[in-house]
A protein has these predicted regions:
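Amphipathic, interaction-prone secondary-structure segments
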Residues: 1-27
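Acidic, low-complexity intrinsically disordered segments
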Residues: 31-77
Length: 77
C-alpha cells in the first residue's frame, strides 16, 4: 500500500487499482488525524462499488503496521 496526502486529506493506494481518499488534518509532531467516517468510497473507476467495514479496518491495520519513526503517524478517529 502507498499512502500519500496533503494538508487536509490522505490517500490509501492499495496498488491494485483501488484508491481511497479520507479527510483529516495535520497535527503537531508529524501526526495526521484521519476522519474515519470519511472513509466511505473508492476513487474513480471504482467509485460505484461499496466499501465494507472490513475493508476500512484492513486499510487501518495495514497503515498502522507501516508506521515507523521516519513516517507521519496516522491517528484514526
Amino acid at each position: 500500500m502507498k499512502i500519500t496526502g496533503g494538508r487536509g486529506y490522505v490517500k490509501f493506494d492499495l496498488e491494485n487499482g483501488y484508491i481511497m481518499k479520507a479527510e483529516g488534518e495535520m497535527l503537531i509532531d508529524n501526526t495526521f488525524l484521519v476522519y474515519k467516517d470519511t472513509m466511505k468510497s473508492w476513487e474513480v473507476p471504482h467509485n460505484n462499488e461499496k466499501v465494507s467495514d472490513e475493508q476500512v479496518e484492513n486499510i487501518i491495520k495495514t497503515s498502522c503496521k507501516m508506521m515507523n519513526k521516519n513516517t507521519i503517524h496516522l491517528i484514526f478517529e
